[in-house]
């Protein structure tokens, strides 16, 4: 097999932009599809930064998203798999297609897994993950953990059953969680619960799989302009919590970066000639007291 791997990226999604932000480098330029501006979630940012440099297999949510990724990132529509990885049938279909493509191309397969940020069947107050403990919809936690943890374990098990790992000398599995996995913040209990669950699970998976030359990397990004902060309530609460910590931020100055930064971190892990266990990355200005 050649050294240039096939990269499977799960959880990729584009969201119509409802709010436009600026970064420390100026106004953020959003992707455009049929006249509409779109924001990338973490996985979509990985797609954008790797497209054209690697063969990609993108696992998203809706069939219609294939056309968006094709036009904005150059991903062929036959390399987009709409799937709900909480469903056993979709896991099997995804793993089967990935294994077949791995053998067709004759290259190693690496996995980039993203479990999403707020995928839950439970109704969230204000449609936001941000909530004080007294107002938190705790029944959302099982859904959030399922999307971040169960999907990863089931996918890895299915890929193993299809012989993916046995056909290559080593494998890189990169899971994108969040800085919230290790840095708690007021009113962010739901996000902390799902990402911290993923963080702990990944540490255990790494102990299990490293002896088999399956190397596990966790990437923990900070506040990202994915559409999460387009919700007015979420933005207002985030600013209030930030002010309680002594930082005078507004919607115009709230520290955010784009998902391209996450994609660049993934690119480094893919190319690094070593086992990269963890990467934490924050936008400039996000909670300097946590800078250490």
Residue positions per predicted region:
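Canonical Rossmann dinucleotide-binding motif of NAD(H)/NADP(H)-dependent dehydrogenases/reductases
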Residues: 2-56
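Rossmann-fold scaffold of SDR-type NAD(P)-dependent oxidoreductases
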Residues: 10, 106-124, 148, 175, ...
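Catalytic loop of short-chain dehydrogenase/reductase
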Residues: 15-18, 132-137, 165-197, 202-203, ...
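Rossmann-fold cofactor-recognition segment
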Residues: 73-89
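Amphipathic alpha-helical dimer-interface segment in Rossmann-like NAD(P)H-dependent oxidoreductases
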Residues: 99-100, 116, 143-169, 207
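Catalytic Tyr-X3-Lys loop
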Residues: 109-112, 127-153, 198
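C-terminal helical subdomain
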Residues: 150, 218, 237-292
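Conserved Rossmann-fold SDR core element
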Residues: 199, 209-226, 274-280
């Amino acid at each position: 097999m050649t050294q240039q791997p096939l990269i499977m990226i799960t959880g990729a999604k584009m969201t119509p932009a409802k709010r436009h932000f600026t970064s420390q480098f100026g106004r953020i330029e959003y992707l455009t599809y049929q006249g509409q501006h779109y924001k990338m979630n973490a996985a979509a940012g990985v797609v954008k930064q790797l497209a054209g440099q690697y063969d990609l297999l993108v696992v998203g949510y809706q069939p219609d998203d294939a056309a968006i990724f094709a036009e904005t990132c150059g991903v062929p529509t036959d390399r987009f798999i709409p799937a709900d990885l909480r469903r056993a049938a979709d896991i099997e279909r995804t793993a089967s297609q990935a294994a077949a493509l791995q053998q067709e191309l004759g290259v190693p397969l690496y996995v980039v897994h993203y479990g999403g940020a707020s995928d839950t069947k439970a109704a969230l107050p204000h449609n936001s993950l941000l909530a004080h403990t007294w107002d938190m919809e705790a029944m959302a936690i099982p859904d959030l953990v399922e999307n971040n943890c169960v999907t990863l374990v089931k996918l890895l098990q299915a890929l193993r059953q299809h012989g993916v790992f046995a056909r290559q000398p080593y494998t890189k599995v990169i899971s994108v969680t969040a800085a919230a996995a290790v840095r708690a913040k007021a009113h962010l209990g739901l996000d902390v619960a799902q990402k911290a669950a993923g963080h702990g699970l990944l540490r255990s998976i790494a102990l299990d799989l490293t002896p088999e030359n399956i190397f596990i990397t966790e990437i923990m990004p900070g506040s990202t302009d994915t559409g999460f902060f387009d919700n007015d309530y979420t933005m207002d609460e985030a600013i209030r919590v930030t002010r309680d910590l002594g930082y005078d931020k507004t919607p115009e100055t709230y520290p955010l970066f784009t998902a391209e930064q996450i994609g660049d971190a993934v690119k480094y892990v893919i190319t690094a000639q070593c086992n990269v266990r963890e990467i934490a990355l924050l936008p400039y200005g996000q909670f300097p007291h946590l800078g250490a």
